[in-house]
UniProtKB/Swiss-Prot annotation:
The gene is Agtpbp1. Metallocarboxypeptidase that mediates protein deglutamylation of tubulin and non-tubulin target proteins. Catalyzes the removal of polyglutamate side chains present on the gamma-carboxyl group of glutamate residues within the C-terminal tail of alpha- and beta-tubulin. Specifically cleaves tubulin long-side-chains, while it is not able to remove the branching point glutamate. Also catalyzes the removal of polyglutamate residues from the carboxy-terminus of alpha-tubulin as well as non-tubulin proteins such as MYLK. Induction: By axonal regeneration. Zn(2+) binds at residues 912, 915, 1009. PANTHER family: CYTOSOLIC CARBOXYPEPTIDASE, CYTOSOLIC CARBOXYPEPTIDASE 1. It comes from Mus musculus (Mouse). This is Cytosolic carboxypeptidase 1.
């Protein structure tokens, strides 16, 4: 205790001493004659400031007057020693404690007083060196904390004082060093920088810097930093170029690089590079850099630095300079418009499509004439630091602030008479079911009867695809109609050598007789064309695979027993339908025990609640449906993945860890194209714009194809022996949206690392930088009973490239560049046929096949299922409308009344063709709704589902990414859809308007989407209160009364769906989204629970699937979980107590509880939710990235208050039902 008391007394004494000395100094200020006393007092304060942190803290604490006293004394005293003492005190104060104390000194007026002191001291002849050194030192420290420092210094005339000191005392390094530090601070003001340049500061800097020297390295470092800041001025940069200083900088850099063997002067070498980076911001600087052989110099020096990790800043800066100076290249295309043309029935008056049609034919829309004339923005080096602020500013500006616009109000649309055209699509509202064979003829309580099922009729290839299926009557499925028989097949002239498939990562043992057969089989399967139909080998092949392969097929016997096949060996495929699990019985031995164990031991992915219906894939049926699908290119081929089908792989696929240095390695290889031009092949191997082009037949060249449904690949150029540049096609009637890809590759060799570069991407960022991989499908693997898409590729990165993007394609902005997705693949099989896709493909024909299979297999006594035609698309394809609910228990009034009064759920998907994950989620929803599970039956009895599973069939068919054939984003047309240009949106909105007109407003509307920039699954909804809250108008948000029911469904899903993340949800209404389905259905139709459900293209960073890439299993599970969430929502929102048999209630609760046990708490996810890599990800070479439109949808990652997290009062009263 005594020791603590002594310490306390000592601290109190020291504190009191400083306060006393400051009080004494304040009194002395009024008497200018007591200079000796002021000198003594300031020396005592200096001693305390140098020795005790507590003293320094006492003088800079809020409320302390110590700083004012010191500054007042400094301003008024004439005594030199007192001035030096106070300057030393100020240096002690600002040299510790971080920037807070410097800001404190600025807030007390220190900048102005010190600048005035500098001016007064400069009038002495000669100026006192110590005063100048200390004053410049303090100003260099506090200047960056004063936003108006540059203006103050210029107005006071301090610029000339500091510059003259450097000129006059060139050899006095002690004085020159703080002067250079202050010049660097002056130069942050562009006007000051130009003024200093006119007075010879650039020439002065080049006198100070020089070749390698062990002396005065500190001065060299500061001089280079100052020079780099000065050269950010275009005027100064031009002056440096005119005097040949670019060559000087390169020479100095090479000299320091050669002599700095121990890398002790890395900061000096980086300072030289920073000066080069500044001077190459202008076109003249870049030209001078190229002329001085700068590309080769920096390339060679950076390659020599790769072995030393501490030199990474030099490598990264060198890479940035080289990318910036790399000559802008023209994308090797005749036009940026799509290779395919579709004539619209009417041309819009305004908008991008109108501009596209009005563009004169002589205008080059690929690149601007003066694309490289504009100098680069001076703030480019702050691009990464400012990106988040720019995004946040954009989002805040995009938030709707007009309360009147936010309030839902039904807009007068079509009249009742006009809406009557949709009556035939709602027969469930008027049907009395007198002609149906229902389960019961008497009203009685519902009793679930397990798996009672009706007849299942699987359509075959001989059936015609029905265009409009009515309701099922008398418990019998719709009658079949024969389709025209196919034409005779023609021999495929493009046979390629194929070897037997090998298992990924392992070898397969092949029977001698099987080898030649399977080799011929894959060789013959070079193309599946719609003209090939059964003819010559009908006795040996399954109907789904009966093609004229152009060669005889040898009858084989299976060398291994297959327990899952009843009869095997006499033919290639058994049975009427192709079952992919039986493809091992082609004469190929099944995998050996070790290989089998390696697959089976792989950790299994969590299972989805499976429907008990039959498989939905039927190759035979798929071919017949494709024949009726209308595409603009008139596709005649079928991709193998769509034909064979896809099943989720039985193993998990983790998010890929990014190797260190992969981006700079790829960029260095791109730069080598300019340095070593003789190594570049530059040969076109695939060209959609040249109909007469034939694929080269060289054995070492890959062959490409995308002429099938949903395919997108426009041109391929072979760069090196195993490197290819790929160019994607624009959306039809558009000149951009290059993101979705789906193409075929063949002719590969195992053991070769093939690099693929997709070089005309447009988005400024991608999940490919954060662990996402493209998808690959191997035909050899499918024949080996592994028919699945898998994540494939290494060394994946996404970065800005040197291909120029024209202002026509960039919305009027000049100087934009494209981005590259690059990935490397090692193929395991020789001469395989492989497919690559941006995400799991799901074609329009696949949807039609799935719907037909669901219709054929459902139990008509239990499930009410209708597949109607909503409308025809621009190209004449039908847009299906599906109605699903439970059949009434009987045709008695009570049951019919209950049937008709069920609330509606309206679902839609795939308005954006490239978001294929939306279709997989919809598939999960449809399969669940059609299943025989108890909760599915309960769900059907609770709601009537109206579903438009594909809002943009034409876009999906033709391989578009975002638009329909009208060249417009259909999800921006909901406010005023044109019936001729946007028929699917026009009629989907008409359905909703009809429901509103007949007072049957849907309880929930949800549009399924995919998100390319974020992880997990999440929802966007609409809320007035949360939108106003994000405008920071708290008073206005407090006055708004709003039902919080819109949060209920997302919160339910966050508990039961492992991929769903509540913290990523947003309920803010943005101006840029006012014409989307979510906002229009909420605002105009009046549906409170109007959502967009976004599914990641990449994977999850929370919950059960944390660290895993998402697959079709997880997407379909999300669709099923969405249905379970709707059932729980029913119990929370029902006006009457909703009781179920206890066994059903327990069943659902068990399902929910099991999901909750394995779901970790969600994390708050920001727009850029990824941690930084050890290697800084640099997406661009020079200019600020354009703000991605999609980022606007991220607005409002909202952290709700406790009250808003709770359910509404009406919901809380019913929580006992859960």
């Amino acid at each position: 205790m005594s020791k603590l008391k002594v310490v306390g007394e000592k601290s109190l004494t020291n504190s009191s001493r400083v306060v006393g000395l400051l009080a004494q100094l304040e009194k002395i200020n009024t008497d200018s004659t007591e200079s000796d006393t002021a000198r003594y007092v300031t020396s005592k304060i200096l001693h305390l400031a140098q020795s005790q942190e507590k003293t320094r803290r006492e003088m800079t604490t809020k409320g302390s007057t110590g700083m004012e006293v010191l500054l007042s004394t400094l301003e008024n005293t004439k005594d030199l020693q007192t001035v030096l003492n106070i300057l030393s005190i100020l240096i002690e104060l600002v040299s510790s404690g971080g920037g807070r104390r410097a800001s404190f000194l600025v807030a007390k007026g220190g900048s102005q007083i010190l600048l005035q002191l500098l001016m007064n001291a400069s009038k002495d002849s000669p100026p006192h060196e110590e005063v100048m050194v200390q004053t410049h030192s303090i100003l260099a420290k506090i200047g960056p904390k004063d936003k108006k420092f540059g203006v103050k210094a210029r107005v006071n005339g301090a610029l000339t004082v500091t510059l003259n000191l450097v000129k006059q005392h060139f050899q006095n390094y002690r004085l020159v060093l703080p002067c250079l530090q202050l010049l660097r601070v002056y130069s942050t003001n562009s006007v000051n920088s130009v003024s200093l340049g006119k007075n010879g500061v650039v020439e002065l800097m080049f006198k100070i810097i020089g070749p390698f020297s062990k002396k005065n390295s500190g001065l060299m470092k500061v001089a280079l930093d100052t020079l780099a800041a000065l050269l950010k001025s275009k005027t100064n940069a031009r002056r440096a170029v005119d005097r040949g200083y670019v060559q000087v900088l390169l020479t100095i850099y090479v000299d320091w690089h050669r002599h700095d063997n121990r890398h002790r002067n890395m900061l000096i070498r980086k300072g030289i590079l920073q000066s080069l980076k500044s001077v190459t911001n202008i076109k003249l600087g870049r030209k001078a850099f190229i002329d001085a052989n700068g590309m080769k110099i920096l390339y060679n020096t950076s390659q020599e630095c790769l072995a030393v990790r501490t030199l990474d800043p030099l490598v990264n800066t060198s890479s940035l300079i080289m990318r910036k100076c790399f000559p802008k290249n023209r994308l090797p295309l005749p036009t940026i418009k799509s290779s395919f043309h579709f004539q619209l029935p009417i041309i819009p008056v305004t908008g991008p499509v109108a501009q596209l049609y009005s563009l004169p034919p002589e205008v080059d829309d690929v690149v601007d004439e003066s694309d490289d004339n504009d100098d680069i923005d001076l703030e480019v080096e702050n691009e990464l630091e400012n990106e988040d602020d720019l995004d946040q500013s954009f989002k805040n500006d995009d938030i709707e602030t007009d309360i009147n616009k936010l309030r839902p109000q039904q807009v007068p649309g079509r009249t009742i008479e006009e809406l009557k055209m949709y009556e035939h699509l709602f027969p469930e509202l008027v049907d009395d079911f007198q002609d149906y064979e229902l389960i019961s003829k008497e009203p009685k309580p519902f009793v679930f009867e397990g798996k009672a099922r009706g007849p299942i009729v699987v359509p075959t290839a001989g059936e015609e695809v029905p265009g409009n299926s009515g309701s099922v009557k008398k418990g019998v499925v719709m009658k079949e109609r024969a389709s025209p028989k196919g034409e005779e097949a023609k021999e495929d002239p493009k046979g390629h050598d194929r070897t037997l498939p090998q298992q990924l990562g392992g070898q397969s043992r092949v029977a001698p007789s099987a080898h030649s057969f399977n080799n011929d089989l894959v060789k013959a399967l070079d193309r599946i064309t719609l003209q090939n139909v059964p003819s010559q080998v009908a006795s040996g092949l399954n109907a789904g695979m009966r093609k004229d392969f152009g060669l005889p097929l040898t009858v084989l016997s299976c060398t291994k027993a297959c327990p899952h096949v009843a009869k095997c060996g006499s033919t290639l495929f058994e049975g009427r339908t192709v079952h992919l699990g039986k493809l091992c019985c082609t004469g190929v031995e099944t995998e050996d025990d070790e290989d089998t164990e390696s697959h089976s031991s792989t950790e299994q992915a969590p299972s989805v609640e499976a429907s008990d219906g039959p498989t939905l894939h039927d190759p035979d049926l798929y071919i017949e449906i494709v024949k009726n699908t209308k595409s603009v290119p008139e596709y005649s081929e079928v991709a193998y993945p769509d034909y064979f089908g896809h099943i989720p792989p039985p193993f998990k696929e983790p998010i890929l860890e990014r190797p260190y240095g992969v981006q700079r390695t790829k960029i260095a290889q791109d730069i080598e194209r300019l340095i070593h031009q003789n190594d570049i092949i530059d040969r076109v191997v695939y060209d959609l714009d040249n109909p007469t082009y034939t694929t080269p037949e060289e054995g070492d060249t890959l062959k490409f194809n995308s002429k099938f449904e949903s395919g997108n690949l426009r041109k391929v150029i072979q760069i090196r022996k195993s490197e290819y540049d790929l160019i994607l096609n624009s959306d039809i009637n558009s000149n951009h949206y290059h993101q979705w890809f789906y193409f075929e590759v063949s002719g590969m060799r195992p053991g070769v690392a093939y690099r693929f570069n997709i070089i005309n991407c447009e988005k400024s960022n991608s999940q490919f930088n954060y662990g996402m991989q493209p998808l690959m499908y191997s035909v050899q693997e499918a024949l080996n009973a592994r028919p699945w898409w898998i994540r494939m590729g290494t060394d994946i990165c996404y970065y800005k490239n040197h291909f120029s993007r024209s202002s026509v394609a960039a919305g009027g902005q000049k100087g934009k560049s494209y981005y590259t997705i690059t990935f490397t693949v090692n193929f395991p099989h020789k001469d395989d046929v492989c497919y690559f896709a941006y995400h799991y493909p799901y074609t329009y024909s696949t949807l039609q096949m799935h719907l037909q299979k669901l219709e054929s297999a459902h139990n008509p006594q239990q499930i009410y299922f209708r597949k109607d035609v909503l409308c025809e698309t621009l190209s004449g394809n039908i847009c299906p409308l599906v109605t699903i609910t439970a059949m009434p228990e009987s045709n008695y009034y009570e049951h019919i009344c209950q049937f008709r009064t069920r609330p509606y759920i309206f679902l839609s998907a795939r308005v954006h063709p490239g978001e294929t994950n939306a279709s997989w989620v919809m598939k999960g929803t449809l399969e669940y709704l059609m299943s025989n599970s108890p909760t599915a039956q309960s769900l059907r009895e609770s709601y009537i589902f109206k579903i438009v599973p594909m809002l943009n069939p034409d876009g999906v068919i033709n391989g578009n990414h975002r638009c329909s054939l009208s060249g417009e984003d259909l999800n921006r047309q909901w406010q005023s859809p044109n019936p001729e240009l946007h028929p699917t949106i026009y009629h989907a909105k008409g359905l909703l308007q009809y429901l509103a007109a007949v007072k049957r407003l849907p309880l929930v509307y949800c549009d399924y989407h995919g998100h390319s920039r974020k992880k997990n699954v999440f929802m966007y909804g609409c809320s007035i209160k949360e939108t106003v809250w994000h405008t920071h108008d708290n008073s206005a948000s407090c006055d708004i009364v709003e039902d919080m029911g819109y949060r209920t469904l997302p919160k339910i899903l966050s508990h039961i769906a492992p991929a769903f993340c509540m913290s990523s949800c947003s309920f803010v209404v943005e101006k840029s989204k006012e014409s989307t389905a979510r906002v229009v259905v909420w605002r105009e139709i009046g549906v409170q629970r109007s959502y967009t459900m976004e599914s990641t293209l990449c994977g999850c960073d929370q919950g059960r699937y944390k660290g895993l890439q998402i697959g079709t299993r997880e997407l379909e599970e999300m669709g099923a979980k969405f249905c379970v969430g709707l059932l729980r929502l029913k119990r929370l929102t029902s006006s009457l107590e909703y009781n179920l048999p206890s066994n059903l209630l327990d069943f659902e609760n068990d399902l929910i509880e099991s999901s909750c046990k394995v779901t970790s708490p969600t994390t708050y996810v920001l727009d850029e939710d990824e941690p930084r890599f050890l290697e800084e990800v640099d997406y661009s070479a020079e200019s600020n990235d354009e703000l991605d439109v999609e980022l606007a949808e991220n607005t409002g990652d909202y952290e709700p208050s406790a009250q808003e997290e709770a359910l509404s009062d009406s919901e809380v009263s019913r929580t006992h039902l859960i």
